[in-house]
């Protein structure tokens, strides 16, 4: 009886991680209408953010339409109007953590259970836009507009 030992090699491939998915829905245009420069102007809307990570974590980054992503509204020749952006990972709030252009705010958690927010909580976060009273007082009468881009990333 002859016994031979053959080397045994096994190639074990790690299973690919499930694709990390995040989604934001429920965003609408924010219209301030005619404003009086007596106090700050604040508008909030509740949105839905979904994250499929086990802890449902995400980070949010905001970019405005001003130079370098600044949060400004433009009125063409009438100038610009600065605004602030706040975020909360809870819905129905009119204040949150201040965001800076291009800087991610991490540590956010979603309660959404469905990627399209069609079932479970339909609103999970608050977006707040604030125009400071001093900026309103210094602004010329005009129609101002701008674009805010939000990026949601898994965390």
Positions of predicted regions on the chain:
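Bacterial N-terminal signal peptides that target proteins for export
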Residues: 1-7
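N-terminal signal peptide c-region/cleavage motif recognized by signal peptidases
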Residues: 14-16
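N-terminal small/polar-rich segments of proteins
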Residues: 19-88, 112-155
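Extended, solvent-exposed segments with strong compositional bias
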Residues: 92-120
